């Protein structure tokens, strides 16, 4: 599974500005989804890879980013 990492309290994606390989995105993906996850910056959001199937990613149902 893949997807944008999401702030569970706000429903917002994690923003990034350095597209492609991005240490911030990689670190955040690993923190939220485990050490097997990968991450990079895609379309100014942190995109996480190698997630378990039940991983919660953006968008959250009934929670829009405010």
From Swiss-Prot:
Principal location listed in the UniProt entry: secreted
Domain of life, source organism: Eukaryota
Positions of disulphide bridges: 12-65, 16-41, 25-46, 29-48
Cellular localisation: Secreted
Tissue expression pattern: Expressed by the venom gland.
Record has Secreted as a keyword: yes
Record keywords, A-Z: Disulfide bond, Ion channel impairing toxin, Neurotoxin, Secreted, Toxin, Voltage-gated sodium channel impairing toxin
Function description: Beta toxins bind voltage-independently at site-4 of sodium channels (Nav) and reduces peak current and shifts the voltage of activation toward more negative potentials thereby affecting sodium channel activation and promoting spontaneous and repetitive firing. This toxin is slightly toxic to mice.
Protein name per the record: Beta-mammal toxin Cv1
Biological source species: Centruroides villegasi
């Amino acid at each position: 599974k893949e997807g944008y990492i999401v702030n569970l309290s706000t429903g917002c994606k994690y923003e990034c500005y350095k597209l492609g390989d991005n240490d911030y995105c990689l670190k955040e993906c690993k923190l939220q989804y485990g050490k097997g996850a990968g991450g990079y910056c895609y379309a100014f959001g942190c995109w996480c890879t190698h997630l378990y199937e039940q991983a919660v990613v953006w968008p959250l149902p009934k929670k829009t980013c405010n």
